Amino acid sequence: MNFSESERLQQLSNEYILGGVNSPSRSYKAVGGGAPVVMKEGRGAYLYDVDGNKFIDYLQAYGPIITGHAHPHITKAIQEQAAKGVLFGTPTELEIEFSKKLRDAIPSLEKIRFVNSGTEAVMTTIRVARAYTKRNKIIKFAGSYHGHSDLVLVAAGSGPSQLGSPDSAGVPESVAREVITVPFNDINAYKEAIEFWGDEIAAVLVEPIVGNFGMVMPQPGFLEEVNEISHNNGTLVIYDEVITAFRFHYGAAQDLLGVIPDLTAFGKIVGGGLPIGGYGGRQDIMEQVAPLGPAYQAGTMAGNPLSMKAGIALLEVLEQDGVYEKLDSLGQQLEEGLLKLIEKHNITATINRIYGSLTLYFTDEKVTHYDQVEHSDGEAFGKFFKLMLNQGINLAPSKFEAWFLTTEHTEEDIKQTLKAADYAFSQMK
């Protein structure tokens, strides 16, 4: 494929935009470098770049797009609302309608508040948990990304009794000292951290199904034990469902798994492609938030009518019959096809799939925790990524990310993807 116009625009972008991108995940640094492809248009399962190339898209904006690009029903809703106004700074009926649809789908959201991103949602749930418990420390799991606020950009210490350290320049040591990081799916490490820190722990932050070092399921009983241990310690359980809400079924992962948290953060999919975030949970905890309580959270754009209208339209599409069955079927076809090709070409790789989402790891281990992904073959992934890109298959440029299917992908798209993977694997020997 020819990418000359993307290369030209990337050089121009570097003159004005720091690093040439507005999020570091969009650069190709993790796959060997080069100018990222500059996209011009999205339709359904496809993206079109400035050089006129067409791509089958499995990036899907890192997860928010589940109904395909420019879905007619959502696009129409956005256009209609834009003609009426996009921001009022007052309550609207749309906020009520959208909140009701969300609570009907996720019953644990007894009370809801909207923000503008997953980062804001998680940041605020931590503040609310601290206000409710009157404690400061939180526990998170290694490898899970919860946004770019100081509170969660913390790397693990050497063990469950060790405090974290900043995972980014600009994060104060004093902030990192309030965070303990333990391995996902390691209930003994979690138990040890709780026993050591005791009544200092306000909350534990959990991705019920991990989506930030690929797609990883909790081990049987893990989430149930986290809930029990936490509640026995007076510690709140916060689920980060920014990726998982409405990803696997019409609702949240918590309902699919049958384990209910105290608070939930959500975002990505529920905005229909527009900026959104939100959080909710038990009424007695949520009443800590202003104007009812002392925990302050506000936002000029929070609950704006454009995002509310898009979210309502998105849920109207997803609540139709057969949506998630199709995603699961396509995911199964893609997984089975890739596994056959891995065997055919004797490639060292494994796959984790959860319904219509999967991750291809270049390792011989079944991935259950972050360290396995950290030590997987990033160079091999980088080669695979570029070989696929040059055949019109758009993946996330990182070995840690997932492939996302949408309602608009077809069986023919899967066949074309597998044909491209067949060639890519053949060039990696």
Curated annotation (Swiss-Prot):
Cross-referenced CDD domains: OAT_like (cd00610)
Superkingdom classification of source: Bacteria
Primary localization class, coarse: cytoplasm
Gene name per UniProt: hemL2
Gene Ontology BP terms: protoporphyrinogen IX biosynthetic process
Biological or metabolic pathway of the protein: Porphyrin-containing compound metabolism; protoporphyrin-IX biosynthesis; 5-aminolevulinate from L-glutamyl-tRNA(Glu): step 2/2
Native organism: Staphylococcus aureus (strain bovine RF122 / ET3-1)
Signal peptide per UniProt: none
Cell location: Cytoplasm
Lineage of origin: Bacteria, Bacillati, Bacillota, Bacilli, Bacillales
Catalytic activity, as annotated: (S)-4-amino-5-oxopentanoate = 5-aminolevulinate
The entry's keywords: Cytoplasm, Isomerase, Porphyrin biosynthesis, Pyridoxal phosphate
Subunit structure: Homodimer.
GO CC annotation terms, alphabetical: cytoplasm
Pfam families on file: Aminotran_3
Family membership noted in the UniProt record: Belongs to the class-III pyridoxal-phosphate-dependent aminotransferase family. HemL subfamily.
E.C. number(s) listed in UniProt: 5.4.3.8
Broad class of enzyme this protein falls into: isomerase
A GO MF term: glutamate-1-semialdehyde 2,1-aminomutase activity
Alphabetical list of HAMAP family matching this protein: HemL_aminotrans_3
Modified residues (N6-(pyridoxal phosphate)lysine): 268
Protein name: Glutamate-1-semialdehyde 2,1-aminomutase 2
Cofactor(s) required, per the database record: pyridoxal 5'-phosphate
Gene3D superfamilies the UniProt entry points to: Aspartate Aminotransferase, domain 1 (3.90.1150.10), Type I PLP-dependent aspartate aminotransferase-like (Major domain) (3.40.640.10)
